[in-house]
Each structure stands twice: as C-alpha cells, then as structure tokens.
UniProtKB/Swiss-Prot annotation:
Disulfide links within the chain: none
Compartment list: Cell inner membrane
Source species: Rhizobium johnstonii (strain DSM 114642 / LMG 32736 / 3841) (Rhizobium leguminosarum bv. viciae)
Record's GO cellular component terms: plasma membrane
Identification of the protein by name: Probable potassium transport system protein Kup 3
Predominant localisation class: membrane
Amino acid sequence: MTDSKLRSADPELEHQTRQGLPSLVLAALGVVYGDIGTSPLYAFREALHATGGSGADRANVLGILSLIVWALTIVVTLKYVTFVLKADNRGEGGTLSLMTLAREGLTGRPKWVLVLGVIGASLFLGDAIITPAISVLSAVEGIEVVAPALSNWVVPITLTIIAVLFFVQRFGTSGVASVFGPVTALWFIVLGVSGAIHIFDDPSVLAAVNPVHALQYIANNIGSAIAVLGAVFLAVTGAEALYVDLGHFGRRPIVTAWFSLVFPSLLLNYFGQGAFVLANPEMAEHPFFSMHPEWARIPMVCLATAATVIASQAVISGAYSLVRQAMHLNLLPRLRILHTSETQSGQIFMPQVNNLLFIFVAALVLFFQNSSGLSAAYGIAVTGEMFITSILLFIVMRRIWSWKLTAALAVIVPITLIDAGFLAANIAKFAEGGWVPVAVASTMALIMQTWTAGRRLLAARTKADEIPLSAIIDNLARKKPPTVPGTAMFLTSDIEGAPTALLHSLKHYKVLHEQNVILSVVTSTTPFVPDDEKIFLESFNRHFSRLVITFGYMETPNIPRALVLARKLGLKFDIMSTSFFLSRRTILPSKKGGLPFWQDRLFISLAENASNATDYFGLPSGRVVELGLQTTI
C-alpha cells in the first residue's frame, strides 16, 4: 500500500505505523504545546494586575484560578480535544482544512464559508506575529527578578534571541528538532513540580476547582471582570495549535500528551502560583519566577527562554504551513518555498514570510517594550479564530457527521457563548494594543480577497479571448503544419480552452511538435491525493493529448515527479527532448475593470512579485520556454 493511499484511508494509522506512540507524544510536546505551555509565565500575573490593585485578595485569587481552570477545561479539553480534533480533513487540521471540509458538506460550496476560512487564516497570521514577541519577552523578563540592575537589557536580549531565531530558519530545524520534545517535556515537569510544592503554601486554593468561585467573581466584580477575562484567556492561547498540527502527529498522540502531562502540569502550576501569592502578596508582580528559590531562578530563566523559543518556532512553522496551504488553494500568490530537509516534506523555509514575520515581531518588541503591554495585543486574533472554528465545527457536525440539530446545538451553543465572552473581553483591549493583530489580519484578508478576485477576473478575460481546444485540434488535423521531433507540454489553467502558449507558438514558430500535451494542474479540496487518483490522461489523436494532474493542498506540486506516474499510464515522452511552454502575462490596470483601480494595482503588484511557475512546479529550467503577452483587467 502506498503512503498516499494509507494517508487517505486511515490517517491515524499512518502516524502509528511510522513511529511508536511514545515518540510521537514526545515530539508533539515540542511542537503542539509550546505556546500554551509558556502561558504560565504571564497569564496569572496579568489576571492579577487586571483586578485593579486588589489582586492578592483571597476571593480574587480563587476567582481567577477558577476561571483559568474552567477555561482550560472547556476551551481546550472539551472543545478542541473532544470535538475539534475529530473534525480532520483526511488527517489534516487547521482553519483552511476545516473550511474546505465544511464547504464539502454544503450544497453549492457557498462563498461565505470561504470568507470565514480566509478571516480565520488571517487571524492566525495576526496572532503569529505576537506569540514570539510576548513569549520570548516574558521569559527574558525573569532577569528583572534575578538581577534588577539588568532590567534595561531585557529588550536588547529579546531582540537578539528573536533575530537569531529568524536567521537560522533558512538552515532548517531538523537538526535541533529532536531536542524540542525533551526540553518541552522537562519544562512541563518543572511547571508541575514547582507548582505542586507551592500548593502547600496555602492548600485552600484547590477549592478553585469549584466553578462557583468563577461565577461569584464575575458577579461581584462587574467593573473589572471584562479585563480579567481578557487576561484569563491568555491561559488558553495556543489551544488552536492542537488542531493546526493534527496532520503532523495524529489525534491520539496529541490527546495523550494533553491528559498525561500538559493539562496536569498547567493546573498544578497555576494553583501553585495562586497559593504562593496568597502566602506572599508582595510577590504578585512576578509570581512565576519569584516562587522559585534564588539558586533556581537563573536556570529557570534559561529553561523558560528555551521553551519560548521552541514555542515561537512552532508558530513560525505553522505560519509557513498556512501560507503554503493558502497558496495551493489560490488564496495567495505563489511564494518561494525552500525545502530544508531531504526526508521531511513539511520542513520548509519561505524567505518572504520569514522576513515579514521578523520585521513585525521586532517592531512589536520595540513598540511595547514589555510583556504586560503586549498582553493587551494578544488574544483578540486567537479568540476571533476560535469563534470561527466553532461556526465551522457546527457545519461539520450537521453536514459531515450528520448530527441532529438539537445535539449539535447542545454542544456548540455553550462553547460559542464562551468564545463570544472571551472575544468581547479581548475587543475591550482594542485601543490598548488589540488593534495590532486586527490590522495585520485585515491586511492579510484584503490581500487574499484581492488575489482571488483578481484571478477570477483574469480567468474571465483570458477565457473570453481563448479558442476551444477541440476547434484548434480539428483545424490542425485539416491544415497540418510542419512537425518537429520531441514533446511539447503546454501549461494552462483552463482545461477546455486552447493554451495561449500553444497559439503563440503556432503563430511565431509555425511548427508543431510530434507530441503535444495540454497540461493542467488542479488543486484538490483534500490535503493529499493518492497516486492512483492523481493523473487523468486523455488522447485526442496521435499528436494531441490532455493531462490533468491533481495535487492535494498540502502537497508540493512537483510536475516532473507526477509525470513519472503519467508514464505508467501510457504517456510516452523523453524528458530530455520535452519542452514546457508557459505563458507569462503582463497585467495592465483598467479604470473600467471589475476591481477598483487601487485594487487593480495591488493585484498587479502581487502577481509581479509571485514566484515563477518554473520554480513553483519544479520544472527543469533548461527545458522551459516562456511566451509573454499582455492582459488588461
């Protein structure tokens, strides 16, 4: 059985057959749980600060702890672990995977679901610029506890770490990825042990498992409850990573890691911080680092920094993966992709994405200067993405899983209300910094909308000028031009129309190759396409045939590799005597076009900066012929 068949038939089995469960659990710790695992650095502290100066009060501490406990229980354990992880698209997760799955279940594949997916993906990218900044900054701020005199060095050290992190992306992370899991496992063990020790400072904090404390706190503190909820949400940021990385590890390792180590360690640490603050109210400024003995603080700063770098790496890799999915789904222009591993196709480096992320992350550190300031910016993008996930999950429950309406509503309504509550709490922080991820997400959504609308308009313009392929073939059969040896493959996005490159080739060269293949590349709504479903080959006559290659949106569209499959189906050609003909369009704006003039200019700029088709499809550059033409939109 081929790898692609196995992936389609049973994605969970595929993961289990390649690696044992323990090794997958360890690997998942380093990738999936880095973000949520570093939340104890700042979540409880920011919730205390949000109370307005009375944070160390027992009722406040118990209320905040109860809110954190039940946020982790409902948002992560109930929503993501229990339901969302089951909504895989042939083994893959993430907003775009869920969007394509939901669209499959609806008649006519409505555009509003696509819009939700675009917004969700844009919000993820808005969050991706904040996670590295707040995570690394909060870890380095431990220096303020260890050596207050070095406080002025927090920002320079943070910027140095971030610069190194983004610089080494070009070399790949496969060499050090093997230590991510063990380091993160050590981090969670230390979280759990240090928290368990300090619970004995005031064991009464365990009463916070009773949700009554959370409800009482909200009822008794209407004025500050919104701000506190916004800070409490920081404890669950990173929950979306469970679903984003589903395709890398499978559901079982992610669930096992959550229940066996991550969830217990987080609870113990938050309870420990709460007990420590009740016993030492003066330490509420930096409870995480302060609750460790002096001899352990420097090692904890180092371990926390390592954990936040790993968490940042996971977010960066997630951004690469999301952008690649968006490219293959034609939501973004083609960008340059470099593979940094010979054995793992998921190990990629995208220079343009990397540079933009670095600029934004560094700018955030310089602008906000501390993690408390950044916490105001953190959350609004994640809550928005989680809210969209709930809507898409409801569609999947009804249309894909065939749940009854009452059952689906019984699950989704409470979850969505909680999502809405957290979203409202984070929207309240818009002026303090929440505008940052919203601005980034809005920009990304505008780019995606412009690209899809521009491509649609360009396709319509092109189709209006095209001649049906059947008409060209019939005409050439009657008036056969001179033929030359070899094979010509003409790439086109329109399966029925005659490729513009073919028409221009006939016009300028006035010859025809012995064999002409009309080649189209199609992206499926599934993440992976089995080899036996990848190729559609149709012969018109001895000179012309049509070849359609279908790739999944998680696959790298490598045409030469796919041609090996086509050869097995009877396509005869010699790669060394095959020429690939492409059309390179120069797009001109028009004030009478279908888009506003400024959006025309944006689309043209995106098209001009897109990676060329030769590199994108892995074509041998020495065998490619590009024919230029102008199109007005």
